[in-house]
Amino acid sequence: MDIRPNHTIYINNMNDKIKKEELKRSLYALFSQFGHVVDIVALKTMKMRGQAFVIFKELGSSTNALRQLQGFPFYGKPMRIQYAKTDSDIISKMRGTFADKEKKKEKKKAKTMEQAAAAANKKPGQGTPNAANTQGTAAPNPQVPDYPPNYILFLNNLPEETNEMMLSMLFNQFPGFKEVRLVPGRHDIAFVEFENDGQAGAARDALQGFKITPSHAMKITYAKK
């Protein structure tokens, strides 16, 4: 009997020598191009080695990922992908994380409401200038200088765990991709070379702001000639 499409996909036939954290980071980088990844479950027990679950927020994302990445060479082995027999909440409950996530959400909501109530109870003259000042300074948005179109892209704001394979998996889906060059001693920057300016530009536009990890949005500019 076929397994019905759901938000969670099951992956096996992966290289079981890869460390759990590196595996999860690489899976996130690969699968989040298809949509919002809620969670990745990779257990290092003997029974679960070389296997993982990727949980998407949208059903369409899991379907696209399954179709596009079936047989994708991942750390030297073709991935086998199918829909999971159980959906995301069940897996989260198995791991004991579902209730914790809900508690955190409720705590955050309660704290926000408390802060709003405290602000509303202040005297009219209080807090307003400070709030304005906070808004003016809290969220600076520094612009990354860009250079004229070039066949080489410059990446920055990369997380410490970035490796050549993670970046290659992201960029080799674009026509004209040639290679990724990391900078010795610098984990936060890299260069990606394409065959021409136009192909580099297409990849730049598509992956601008892509989050390799949830806290690091990649910044892409043309490299200086």
Swiss-Prot record:
Compositional bias, Polar residues, is annotated for 127-140
Instruction: Provide the alphabetized UniProt keywords.
Output: Acetylation, Isopeptide bond, mRNA processing, mRNA splicing, Nucleus, Phosphoprotein, Repeat, Ribonucleoprotein, RNA-binding, Spliceosome, Ubl conjugation
What are the transmembrane regions?
Answer: none
Residue ranges, compositional bias (Low complexity): 113-123
What SMART domains does its record include? RRM
Q: Which GO MF terms does the UniProt record name?
A: RNA binding
Q: Where is this cross-link: Glycyl lysine isopeptide (Lys-Gly) (interchain with G-Cter in SUMO2)?
A: 111
Q: Mind telling me which Pfam families this protein's record contains?
A: RRM_1 (PF00076)
Q: Name one GO cellular component term.
A: U2-type spliceosomal complex
Which residues belong to any copy of the RRM domain?
7-86, 151-225
- At which residues is N6-acetyllysine found? 111
Keyword Nucleus part of the UniProt annotation: yes
Query: Which residue stretches belong to region Disordered?
Result: 100-144
Q: Modified residue Phosphotyrosine is at which positions?
A: 151
User: Where does it reside?
Assistant: Nucleus
* Listed CDD domains: RRM1_U2B, RRM2_U2B
GO biological process terms, alphabetically, are: mRNA splicing, via spliceosome
> Hey, which family's this protein in?
Belongs to the RRM U1 A/B'' family.
Give a short account of what the protein does: Involved in pre-mRNA splicing as component of the spliceosome. Associated with sn-RNP U2, where it contributes to the binding of stem loop IV of U2 snRNA.
Task: Summarize subunit and interaction data from the UniProt record for this chain.
Answer: Identified in the spliceosome B complex. Identified in the spliceosome C complex. Present in a spliceosome complex assembled in vitro, and composed of SNRPB2, HPRP8BP and CRNKL1. Contributes to the binding of stem loop IV of U2 snRNA with SNRPP1.
Recorded protein name is: U2 small nuclear ribonucleoprotein B''
Organism field: Mus musculus (Mouse)
Which gene produces this protein? Snrpb2
